[in-house]
Amino acid sequence: YTVKMGSDMVAVGVSGIGDVRGAFAQNEKKLSRYYEVLDAGRFPVERGYALDRDDRIRRETITRLMCNLWLDTVALESEFGIVFAEYFAAELARLSAPDGPVSHGFVAIEAGHIEITGLGRFFVRNVAMIFDRYLESRTSGKPIFSRTV
């Protein structure tokens, strides 16, 4: 992970995920296929997605939580013209549920920001996944990207 997002990020390696000009691309996940495609002189991209507005908002939310362990919700509201508590009402409810990350001490939700705690660092991917709308719509039983432990 990185603390500051650049304008474009090209993925290198098996299963790498790149972010170029508003689109995500994931490299081949099998090593043999990755090298087969490279040897044929092509980029080893398995799939890609053009991001819509909601994707961009969620990407920023997830990236900032995972890379900075902190999310300035006021800044996000300003950047995207949203009211964070309304836009992410369902996600905030999941975070604050009786058996959710807040109750386990992984996350602190304060006015204007969300912070991953010291203990929460070990579970930051699990917390960030709450903001990933595609995980909810998955029906194949296979992970979309990588799994957490």
Residue ranges and their predicted role:
Residues 83-100:
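Short amphipathic alpha-helical interaction segments
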Residues 119-149:
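Short, amphipathic alpha-helical interaction segments positioned at domain boundaries
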Residues 113-117:
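Minor-groove-contacting beta-hairpin "wing" of winged helix-turn-helix DNA-binding domains
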Residues 98-112:
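A short, conserved structural fragment
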Residues 1-85, 142-149:
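C-terminal scaffold of the Radical SAM
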